[in-house]
């Protein structure tokens, strides 16, 4: 039986630094998030984290790019040596090929509330120090994408994930079972204001056993 889990990205209001053109546009932004109930492997405590991020999204002739880099700073409950909290860098990259643009007609796959169809490839990458687990996640992914006809963007993707990790507690890199993820990403401008409402939400299926033979959630 599949065990489902959800991850909700913190939606945020950000200052828009965009310059839009018919065939070339980009948006780069910085942000900060804070939470008090983060969890880490083999740690029963709720962990507080400050998360600083740099994000970039851009479009070109055949599709779009998305890059997000998070720096996560934990409190002392996420620490291996009872000192300062652990530090983590988490990188997300997605490249979506737009079938309409590739076909030379942006409206070739437009119907109803759907603006177009595409195919997304990318990866997640992290490295962490200061805690007992010290994750080194590597996760390429790929799958189809539906792009909805809204101001800004609203994309729904079904992605296949190939996740592996090589934590300090395991002698070699371990690969989990390939598993799917349903992901929703959006960036909606707020009228004439220089602000956008942005975020993401993931729904991830079970990835099988962990590196020690136990179940995953």
Where are these regions (language model features)?
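Cleavable N-terminal export/targeting peptides
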Residues: 1-25
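Short loop/turn motifs that connect adjacent beta-strands in outer-membrane beta-barrel proteins
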Residues: 21-27, 57-66, 99-118, 147-157, ...
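Short glycine/proline- and aromatic-enriched beta-strand/turn motifs that initiate or cap beta-hairpins
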Residues: 22-72
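Hydrophobic, lipid-facing positions within transmembrane beta-strands of outer-membrane proteins
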Residues: 28, 50-54, 89-93, 138-142, ...
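Transmembrane beta-strands of outer-membrane beta-barrel pores
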Residues: 34-38, 71-75, 121-129, 160-166, ...
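Solvent-exposed loop/turn segments connecting transmembrane beta-strands
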Residues: 44-47, 75-87, 126-137, 174-176, ...
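Surface-exposed loop and membrane-interface regions of Gram-negative outer-membrane beta-barrel proteins
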Residues: 68-129
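Detector for outer-membrane/organellar transmembrane beta-barrel domains
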Residues: 133-217
């Amino acid at each position: 039986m599949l065990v489902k889990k959800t991850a909700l990205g913190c939606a945020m209001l950000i200052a828009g630094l965009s310059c839009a053109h018919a065939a070339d546009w980009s948006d780069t932004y910085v942000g900060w998030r804070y939470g008090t109930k983060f969890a880490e492997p083999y740690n029963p405590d709720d962990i507080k984290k400050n998360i600083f991020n740099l994000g970039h999204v851009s479009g070109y002739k055949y599709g779009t790019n998305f890059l997000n880099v998070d720096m996560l700073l934990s409190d002392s409950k996420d620490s291996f040596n009872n000192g300062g909290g652990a530090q983590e860098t988490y990188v997300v990259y997605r490249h979506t090929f737009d079938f309409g643009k590739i076909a030379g007609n942006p409206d070739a796959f437009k119907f109803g509330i759907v603006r177009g169809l595409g195919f997304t490839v990318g990866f997640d990458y992290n490295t962490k120090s200061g805690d007992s687990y010290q994750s080194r996640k590597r996760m390429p992914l790929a799958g189809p994408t539906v792009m909805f006809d809204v101001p800004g963007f609203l994309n729904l993707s079904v992605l296949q994930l190939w996740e592996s990790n090589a934590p300090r507690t395991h002698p070699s890199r371990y690969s989990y079972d390939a598993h799917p993820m349903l992901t929703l990403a959006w960036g909606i401008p707020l009228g004439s204001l220089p602000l956008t409402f942005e975020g993401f939400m993931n729904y991830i299926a079970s990835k099988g056993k962990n590196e020690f033979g136990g179940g995953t959630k």
